[in-house]
A protein has these predicted regions:
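Short, acidic/polar linear motifs in exposed loop/turn regions
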Residues: 40-42, 97
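Short, basic and Ser/Thr-rich N-terminal targeting/leader segments
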Residues: 31, 43-45
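Carbohydrate-binding surface patches
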Residues: 35-39
Length: 110
């Protein structure tokens, strides 16, 4: 079987509250391969990424990236191989400055 990659989710948080970027549907196994974070503001910003396999806890216990700086008007590409197969699970993101970052996840669903 050939995996067909696609955009799994895109989010531009309006505040500094963590929010779900992607959650697999029931019966779906997802592989998240790439996460792009784009800073479209003129200020340096930090971001966090969380992976809660079975819920919505977005803190130190589910963090996979924590307070990573991203320069103004720049892009960060994170390559990974994150598997998700629980429809209650979430890949979530957070920024310290609302309306500054756009997060886009690419991968495959099987």
């Amino acid at each position: 079987m050939t995996l067909q990659e696609k955009q799994l989710g895109q989010l531009r948080p309006i505040d500094s509250t963590a929010a779900s970027l992607y959650s697999p549907g029931a019966g779906v196994t997802a592989i998240i391969k790439t996460l792009f974070i784009v800073n479209t503001s003129t200020s340096d910003v930090t971001f966090r990424v969380f992976m809660d396999d079975d819920g919505t806890t977005y803190d130190e216990t589910t963090a996979i990236f924590w307070d990573v700086p991203i320069l103004a008007n720049s892009t960060v590409e994170l390559s990974s191989f994150l598997a998700m197969n629980n429809s209650s699970g979430n890949l979530a993101v957070r920024t310290n400055t609302g309306s500054s970052l756009t997060f886009t996840a690419f991968g495959a669903e099987v």
